[in-house]
């Protein structure tokens, strides 16, 4: 069995939400204040016996409508549904625990627990009276005064909160059957919060956690020996205990012998103070049990070299891992029927807030794999993890990820794995598999950031943040991630973010793509080949033409590219818009003399198009450029720009040039305000994209 969903109403950041869980690991992600901790708190209210059930005024969702508060006293409801797992066979213990909770009684059973925090009915009339007074008074007062909602909340806190009651109902709420606390004892709820002192709880056998684990695994070679029946195991263990008792008595006798003469001196003071009377004298006596010996044991770390250090001197990250391993061992103890009989736990839940604390990336990945293996081995039934770590996220499958996000009236939920469906409801497996391969520790940031800018290549990835500074746009302030998808694969990502899909993450998405015009000789070519903008749609009798015509996917997914007349690639666009900007010519740029001369000629107002063509060295490609320029109907200025842009495009490599150009443009920014600064025209499609993202 597993907790399949949690329905929360009017609790903290949750106005009305249903969160569906997986049978296994649940990786709950989201930005700060998206409701992750509140979700775990809601879970604990039902399943953690140590959790307080009495809530306060600040536990109510403040996004509740004013009219709702006027009509009825606010109520917090948390409803947990438990279902049969996919590979689960219900045990007798499962059914015995769930018997009174069931709402579906067949093999695919379903059970419900509902927590309510409510104002008893007998106080509702008085509540209405107070509400009428607040509303009537509000109509007579100035509009600038405190709004009615705030007045109602203060009134509830002052006059009614003390009357609020909490109940946990089982099965159908209409039946008003309350939870038997003993049945909840069969649930093992283990919670590691984000601010945890693991050293306090595990370093010494004096601590209950380590003591319980040691006691259970004492004589484990006998307890786990399948060749021995239960009776033989008990005989063997009792033999060891008897042997320990003999040795401990010998030890105590030795202590008594050593203290014999000193004891007389110690106890003489009792006689002198009058503590001895009626011939009754103080003395020393005691027995040494195994449990008391555990308190002597200290957790240490032993290296291959034989060096031993106390665990308290160990790093916090490693101590966190040791603590988790002990906690899982304790859960194994708690679930052992032979050890605890009817007190054994039936359902074990491990809840970890920010498991990445103090762990470097590779250890985060290893931890998640360790937890998954423990779940598969059924040492824990269900695991809940909240995280900000992209490394943790990349270590789980999309099916395990639950994404919480803020909206105007609180928190909502998205399920990335459920978004990959076509218009007929069929699963688009190819896109889902592509995204799962794509989401490494860097690129999984798309699930955390508030907005995402997808780009096709390394040049855009390196240069966009520089361009944003030229435009005085702060990507950091808007929590924008720039993600290079290495090609034109935007369609795979549209499933994740298309707000028309109920399971998607509805954040603002912008895609930058190139126009990339192509043509195909009708008589010679089977495939399209790249062409220059000034060659596009020039000779429709000889060529078929095409270009990248991808359009906006939805209202929150917008696509920007170069214009239809001059557009080709980012490099082409930069040179076209900045035809005399020699900052573009970097160390790795080829054909530097030609490019410098072309830019000088452009600055010469008297230069002609032919003069620029004459600078080009003789080659097949340059002849093609000349033919294209002479055949098109562009103005002379457009032709000059096109020659420079074409020659620049053919002289740079994507990655190396982009890195050098980013450094050069950044250096230019440092000169802003002095004579060394040169103006740079940012491509309009990039300006538009950044403007949309930063709104």
Can you describe what each PLM-predicted range is?
Residues 1-48, 292-295, 299-442, 658-660, ...:
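Switch/communication elements of ASCE P-loop NTPase nucleotide-binding domains
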Residues 1-110, 117-120:
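Nucleic acid-processing catalytic cores of prokaryotic defense/repair systems
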Residues 54-70, 86-231, 242, 426-427, ...:
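Glycine-rich phosphate-binding loops of NTPases
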Residues 69-73, 105-108, 181-185, 316, ...:
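Conserved catalytic network of the ASCE P-loop NTPase/AAA+ motor domain
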Residues 88-94, 123-127, 199-203, 392-396, ...:
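Switch/connector loops and helix/strand junctions flanking conserved nucleotide-binding motifs
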Residues 186, 198-352:
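Extended helical coiled-coil dimerization/tether regions that scaffold
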Residues 373, 378, 393-510:
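RecA-like P-loop NTPase motor core
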Residues 514-643:
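Activity-critical C-terminal alpha-helical subdomain
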């Amino acid at each position: 069995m597993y907790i399949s969903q949690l329905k929360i109403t009017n609790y903290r950041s949750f106005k009305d939400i249903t969160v569906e869980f997986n049978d296994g690991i649940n990786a709950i992600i989201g930005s700060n204040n998206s409701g992750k901790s509140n979700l775990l708190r809601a879970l604990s209210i039902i399943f953690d016996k140590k959790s307080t059930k009495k809530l306060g005024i600040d536990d109510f969702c403040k996004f509740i409508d004013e009219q709702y508060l006027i009509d009825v006293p606010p109520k917090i409801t948390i409803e947990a549904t438990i279902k049969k797992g996919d590979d689960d066979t219900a045990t007798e213990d499962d059914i015995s625990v769930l018997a009174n909770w069931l709402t579906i009684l067949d093999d695919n059973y379903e059970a419900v627990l509902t927590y309510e925090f409510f104002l008893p009915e007998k106080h509702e009339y008085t509540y209405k009276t107070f509400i009428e007074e607040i509303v009537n008074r509000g109509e007579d007062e100035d509009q600038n005064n405190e709004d009615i909602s705030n007045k109602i909340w203060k009134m509830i806190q002052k006059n009614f909160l003390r009357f609020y009651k909490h109940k946990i109902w089982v099965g159908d709420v209409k039946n008003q059957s309350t939870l038997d606390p003993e049945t909840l004892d069969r649930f093992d709820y283990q919670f590691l919060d984000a601010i945890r002192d693991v050293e306090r709880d595990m370093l010494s056998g004096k601590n209950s956690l380590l003591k319980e684990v040691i006691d259970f695994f004492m004589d484990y070679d006998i307890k786990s020996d399948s060749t021995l029946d239960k009776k033989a195991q008990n005989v063997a263990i009792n033999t060891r205990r008897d042997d320990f008792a003999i040795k401990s008595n010998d030890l105590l006798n030795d202590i008594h012998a050593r203290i014999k003469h000193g004891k007389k001196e110690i106890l003489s003071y009792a006689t002198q103070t009058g503590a001895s009377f009626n011939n009754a004298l103080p003395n020393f006596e005691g027995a040494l049990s195994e449990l008391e010996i555990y308190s002597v044991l200290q957790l240490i770390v032993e290296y291959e070299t034989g060096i031993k250090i106390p665990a308290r001197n160990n790093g916090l990250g490693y101590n966190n891992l040791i603590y988790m391993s002990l906690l899982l061992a304790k859960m194994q103890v708690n679930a052992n029927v032979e050890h605890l009989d009817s007190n054994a736990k039936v359902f074990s839940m491990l809840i970890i807030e920010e498991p990445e604390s103090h762990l470097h990336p590779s250890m985060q990945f290893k931890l998640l794999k360790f937890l998954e293996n423990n779940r598969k081995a059924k040492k824990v039934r269900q695991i809940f993890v909240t995280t900000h770590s992209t490394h943790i996220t990349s270590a789980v499958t999309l099916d395990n990820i639950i994404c919480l996000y803020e909206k105007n009236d609180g928190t909502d939920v998205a399920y990335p794995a459920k978004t990959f469906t076509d218009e007929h409801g069929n699963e688009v497996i190819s896109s889902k598999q592509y995204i799962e391969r794509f989401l490494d520790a860097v690129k999984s940031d798309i699930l955390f950031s508030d907005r995402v800018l997808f780009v096709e290549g390394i040049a855009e990835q390196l240069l966009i943040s520089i361009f944003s500074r030229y435009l005085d746009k702060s990507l950091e302030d808007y929590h924008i991630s720039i993600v290079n998808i290495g090609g034109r694969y935007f369609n795979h990502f549209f499933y994740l973010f298309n707000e028309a899909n109920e399971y998607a993450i509805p954040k603002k998405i912008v895609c930058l793509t190139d126009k990339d015009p192509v043509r195909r000789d009708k008589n010679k070519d089977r495939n399209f080949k790249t062409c220059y903008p000034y060659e596009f749609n020039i000779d429709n009798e000889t060529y078929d033409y095409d270009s990248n015509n991808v359009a906006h996917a939805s209202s929150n997914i917008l696509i920007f590219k170069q214009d239809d007349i001059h557009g080709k690639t980012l490099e082409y666009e930069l040179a076209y818009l900045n035809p005399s900007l020699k900052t573009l010519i970097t160390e790795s740029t080829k054909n530097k003399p030609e490019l410098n001369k072309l830019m000088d000629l452009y600055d010469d107002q008297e230069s002609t198009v032919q003069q620029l063509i004459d600078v080009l060295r003789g080659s097949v490609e340059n002849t093609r450029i000349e033919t294209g320029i002479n055949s098109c109907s562009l103005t002379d200025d457009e032709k000059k720009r096109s020659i420079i842009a074409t020659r620049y495009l053919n002289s740079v490599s994507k990655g190396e040039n982009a890195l050098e150009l980013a450094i050069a443009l950044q250096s230019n920014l440092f000169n802003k305000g002095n004579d060394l600064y040169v103006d740079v025209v940012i491509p309009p499609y990039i300006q538009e994209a950044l403007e949309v993202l930063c709104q």
